[in-house]
Regions:
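Nucleotidyltransferase catalytic core that binds NTPs
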Residues: 1-175
Length: 175
């Protein structure tokens, strides 16, 4: 049974040490499912928990407050979709000004290493994080080597299988 938590400090030991898929996962579309699916393969292969980490509210609410709220999927519906993807923990981190002020390095150390004790981290091709969006795949790759966790960046998925939309359109994976 999937658990839903809002704070990384509250993650119980039995859900630490797993594989963490990170993204906004707004809509949980094909690109998002690819990120979570990749993370799920690592988790199943190693017998560790699968965590899907998202941010609530969506960071755009904080950074672009004058625009209409950006939400493709209400929180409860997103949680139900996560449960359907065999996620053990849906960690919907409370995103506010204090959290947004964390540097990318602090996010890696405090959230991924100390809080979740992540064994492996999976993101989409366009995931950025930390104050000023300073963290990216390069930083995660370096941090993984230093801290001892694995890292996978899922490439962009292109729409070329006859589905609606223009051939070659990219499915957003984490934004």
């Amino acid at each position: 049974m999937m658990r839903v938590l809002r704070h990384y400090q509250d993650v119980p030991e039995d859900l630490q040490g797993g594989v963490v898929a990170i993204g906004n996962f707004d809509g949980v579309h094909r690109g998002h499912r690819a990120v979570i699916g990749e993370a799920g393969q690592f988790a199943r292969a190693t017998g560790v928990p699968l965590t899907a980490m998202s941010f609530e509210p969506h960071p755009r609410v904080l950074f672009q407050p004058d625009q209409a709220p950006f939400r493709l999927t209400p929180f409860r519906a997103k949680a139900i979709q996560m449960a359907g993807l065999d996620v053990d923990l849906f960690l919907a981190l409370h995103f506010d000004a204090e959290f947004a002020a964390k540097t990318a390095e602090d996010f890696v150390q405090n959230v991924l290493v100390d809080g979740l004790k992540a064994r492996h981290v999976v993101t989409g091709y366009d995931f950025v994080f930390g104050k000023g969006r300073a963290g990216d795949a390069g930083l995660l790759r370096r941090s993984a080597g230093e801290a001892g966790f694995g890292f996978t960046q899922v490439p962009a998925l292109r729409q070329d299988d006859g589905e609606s939309g223009e051939k070659g359109d990219i499915y957003s994976s984490t934004t």
